Structure formats: structure tokens, C-alpha cells
Design a protein with these regions (language model features):
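A secondary-structure boundary/capping signal
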Residues: 118, 150, 196, 238-239, ...
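Residues that cap or flank secondary-structure elements
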Residues: 122, 152, 198, 245-246, ...
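Short, glycine/acidic-rich beta->alpha junctions
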Residues: 156, 202, 323
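Iron-sulfur-associated redox domains of electron-transfer enzymes in respiratory
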Residues: 1-73, 217-486
Length: 486
């Protein structure tokens, strides 16, 4: 894997070790030793005060990987082995938690309360524009002439930062809050971050933004593995972006998944073909009825945004199901008694799956890589597995920005020339503001708007396995090999 930060290495390593213990039937018996083995005595503890703090962080980071969250802890003395036993019991008799994400309070470093700080670059100038312009009189001057900020009075308005002619005042971001486009993350009175589920759109931007790796998804890995071990039929439906995830042939990737124990593998691109045809017909129908524009509906993060933050956009969102929706029904039709597992790069698919009775579990590409490592499955040695059904190139193109738009236009052929299509390929604050304006005015720069939460599309999803640039390049190469088209 092309790790771009150490927090990815930590997640991968921890889940790999947990899967290894599970595979050896030692999860409950040996999990209590895992934090000690990962941070042995006298080991370096990067970013933590001591080895004991590091071990505590390993312990609590194990909870979401076991399918639990911080609310499940009622007694700090409860050992990991007890949580592991609960996780296995849930996998046998219960269902995954409804929570999608959680903040590991023990790992959260409680970043700065105030975002501005005056550095020693302050020249102690006569103008003192920082002090004069501060609306809360929070800027004071030392006897030396240098300015300083009273953090109890400061409201982080940034006026002093803009006023300083020497750029001596720096802005210190809180990375997770900075990454969140809908202000769903905020600190409590102790400085620990919390995710407001009523605002969160599950875009996953915070997941890799936190430099301490304190934000986790609630995993369903052990629920899936338990079903496979029991001998149940478990079918994997894999997102189109898998073409850009692993540096092996796609047949080897599917072969490795078969080796994990999946009954069958179905490409979500099959479902994308249904999405394309249905969405194309719906678009033409709505435009003929006089509707000014229609947006896509396949990105679950965008659907959450509309439901929670831009309800005025609802009439303009396509009613067509996502590729996962249709692929899950293809799987259920072929294997009525099977558990269906969607595998992709997306956090928000976990929320979509809660509303879809045909999808039982979600796994990410990142989790798949850890599972393969924990089970000691070498992808390059896996027996290649080929699909019996091949989807058109455009269906696989859903993985990249412009892919949905391009597929619909390709399907419509000559009719597409009359349609002006545009794309929104990153749900940041600016894009959300634009979408809100479209909904309010009922006017948009195009008649068909493709919306994806991730910059560049699903190929850059928060739970991707490959490095972004390499993944895009690999996807482009794989798409070029697929000759079938509309």
C-alpha cells in the first residue's frame, strides 16, 4: 500500500494484527497483550507522553475495529478481551452498530482552543493595528513592545491576522474541523472533538485529516469474517474504483477475495448500467416536464448533504438508485439466502446500507488490504478469478469525476447533444454554497449536474488503498482495456 501518513500505517497494522489473532482463534485469549506487543517497554512513543499512553491509545483504537465505539465503555478497567468477546457475540447473535464514525477521546490531542498566535516575528511596531482593530480587546502589548493574545478573550475572528503588516500572526487550524465542510465536528468543554450525527454527511474527510488518527469508522470486518467462517453464503459486490486500488490484475484481486472465502464476486459496475439507463430516461422525462435541472443521486454523502443541509434541493435530485442498490439486487436474485457485502472506498455507503435491506455489510478497500495481510493471503499468488459478466467501460467509469455524466451522455447518444452537463467533484464549503444557491433559485449552470463528495470522484475516497495519483493512473489504464461501450 502507498501510505501517505503514519495514521494509515497504524490503522492497517492494528487491523491486520486483530485479524491474525481471529484467524488463529486467539482473539479473546491474546488481545490483551496486543498493545504491549505493539508498544513494548522503552519503545519510541511518537506524539505521546509515554509508552503507557501509547498502549492506552492502541487499546481504544481497537474498539471501532471490533465494531464497537467509545460509548460501549462503561468501566475503564474492562480489558480488551471482554470487548473482543462482545464483538464475537454480536457477530454471532446481533447486528452491526448504527453508529458510522467515532472519535477516540484517548487519541484526540485536544488541539488548540484559539486559532491565532502571535509569533516572535512581531516587531513591536508603533501602528499596533492588531491591537487597535481587535473587537474584543484581546491583543495586549508587553513591555518589550511585542504583542500577545489573551486566549480567554479571543474569539478567533482573524482580524489581527489580516491586520499585521509583518505576517507575524499565524493561523493554527484544527485539522478535523478544518476538513469538515458542514461543521459537524466540534470540541466539548474538555477540548475533545465530537461528531454531530445530525450534521455529519459521512464524507470521511476528517478520517485522514486528524494528525493523531483519532477518528475511526465503526468496522464490520469481524461480522463479515464470522459469516464466512460459519459457512454462510457471503457475496462481495465491489465498487468500480477497485480497478485503481491494487497493483495486480483485477483477476488476481478477485482471486484473493475468493481465497478469503467469498461465495462469489459481482461488480457494482453491473448495477451502474441500470443506474445509467434509469437516470438517463428520468433526466429526459423531467426536462420535458419543464424542470430546469436534475442532479445525480449515486453519492450517498451528497444525499446526506441534501437531507440535512439543503432540503430545498430534494425536488432536483434523481430518484434513480445507486449502482450499489442495483448490484445488491442482482446478488440477492442469484443468491437469495446470501449476505451481501459492499466493498468500496466510501464511508457514507455505511449509511446508505442502513436504508437498503439488500445490503448486509460494508467493507472498505483499506480494510480488505488489512484482512488479506492478517490472513496471510498474497495477492500475487492468488488463483485468478474472472467475471462471467462484463460491464461496459462507462459503467466502470463511475469511479472517476465525470464518469456518471459521461455514461449518461454516452447512453443517450444524439439526445445528449441537447443537454448541458456539469460536475461538482468535491463537496467543500464553496461547492456546498453553490449547490445551496442552485436549490434556492431553481437555476443551475447545467441541466444535468453530477455531484461527488470526493475530489476526483470515488477513486480518491477516504478509505482507498492506493495512492491517489497512482490510483487515477491505474484506473485510466484499466478503463482503456475495456472495449465494450454503449
Amino acid at each position: 500500500m502507498a501510505f501517505t501518513s503514519n495514521i494509515m500505517i497504524v490503522r492497517h497494522r492494528l487491523l491486520k494484527e486483530l485479524v491474525k489473532l481471529w484467524n488463529n482463534n486467539e482473539l479473546v485469549d491474546k488481545i490483551d497483550r496486543l498493545p504491549i506487543e505493539l508498544s513494548p517497554k522503552r519503545s519510541k512513543h511518537a506524539g505521546r507522553c509515554c509508552v503507557h499512553k501509547e498502549r492506552a491509545v492502541w487499546k481504544y483504537k481497537s474498539l471501532p475495529l471490533l465494531g464497537l465505539d467509545m460509548e460501549d465503555e462503561t468501566d475503564e478497567l474492562t480489558p480488551l478481551s471482554e470487548y473482543a468477546a462482545r464483538a464475537l457475540d454480536r457477530a454471532e447473535n446481533g447486528r452491526p452498530k448504527d453508529n458510522i464514525m467515532c472519535v477516540i477521546d484517548e487519541a484526540c490531542s485536544a488541539c488548540v482552543q484559539i486559532n491565532y498566535e502571535i509569533t516572535n516575528l512581531c516587531r513591536g511596531c508603533t501602528a499596533r493595528s492588531c491591537q487597535v482593530n481587535c473587537p474584543k480587546k484581546a491583543v495586549h502589548v508587553k513591555e518589550s513592545g511585542q504583542a500577545w493574545i489573551d486566549h480567554d478573550a479571543c474569539i478567533s475572528c482573524g482580524i489581527c491576522h489580516k491586520s499585521c503588516p509583518y505576517h507575524a500572526i499565524v493561523y493554527i487550524p484544527v485539522p478535523c474541523e478544518e476538513a469538515c465542510p458542514v461543521k459537524a465536528i466540534s470540541k466539548d468543554e474538555k477540548g475533545i472533538e465530537h461528531i454531530d450525527e445530525s450534521k455529519c454527511i459521512y464524507c470521511g474527510k476528517c478520517l485522514n485529516a486528524c494528525p493523531f488518527g483519532a477518528i475511526f469508522e465503526i468496522s464490520q470486518v469481524f461480522d463479515v469474517l464470522h459469516r464466512i467462517r460459519k459457512g454462510e453464503q457471503v457475496v462481495a459486490i465491489v465498487a468500480p474504483s477497485i480497478l485503481g486500488q491494487f497493483k495486480m490484475t483485477i483477476e488476481q484481486v478477485y482471486g484473493a477475495l475468493k481465497q478469503v472465502g467469498f461465495t462469489d464476486i459481482i461488480e457494482v459496475a453491473q448495477g451502474a448500467m441500470d443506474t445509467v439507463s434509469n437516470e438517463a430516461h428520468e433526466l429526459i422525462e423531467k426536462l420535458e416536464e419543464g424542470q430546469k435541472f436534475m442532479t445525480t443521486s449515486c453519492c450517498p454523502s451528497y444525499i446526506e448533504l441534501v437531507n440535512k443541509h439543503i432540503p430545498a434541493m430534494k425536488p432536483y435530485v434523481s430518484d434513480t438508485g445507486s449502482p450499489m442498490y442495483y448490484a445488491a439486487r442482482i446478488a440477492k436474485e442469484k443468491y437469495p439466502d446470501a449476505k451481501v457485502v459492499f466493498i468500496g472506498p466510501c464511508v457514507a455507503k455505511r449509511k446508505e446500507a442502513q436504508r437498503d435491506e439488500a445490503v448486509d455489510f460494508i467493507m472498505t478497500f483499506e480494510e480488505v488490504a488489512s484482512v488479506l495481510a492478517g490472513l496471510d493471503i498474497q495477492m500475487e499468488q492468488a488463483k485468478p478469478y474472472s467475471m462471467s459478466f462484463t460491464s461496459v467501460r462507462e459503467a466502470h467509469g463511475f469511479a472517476q469525476a465525470g464518469g456518471v455524466m459521461g455514461a449518461v451522455k454516452a447512453y443517450l447518444k444524439e439526445e445528449a447533444d441537447k443537454i448541458n452537463a456539469v460536475q461538482v467533484a468535491n463537496l467543500d464549503k464553496k461547492a456546498i454554497g453553490a449547490l445551496r444557491a442552485y436549490a434556492k433559485s431553481g437555476k443551475a449552470p447545467g441541466q444535468f449536474i453530477e455531484v461527488m463528495a470526493c475530489e476526483g470522484g470515488c477513486i480518491t475516497g477516504p478509505c482507498s488503498h492506493n495512492e491517489i495519483t497512482a490510483g487515477k493512473r491505474q484506473l485510466t489504464q484499466e478503463l482503456a482495456k475495456r472495449k465494450e461501450t454503449y
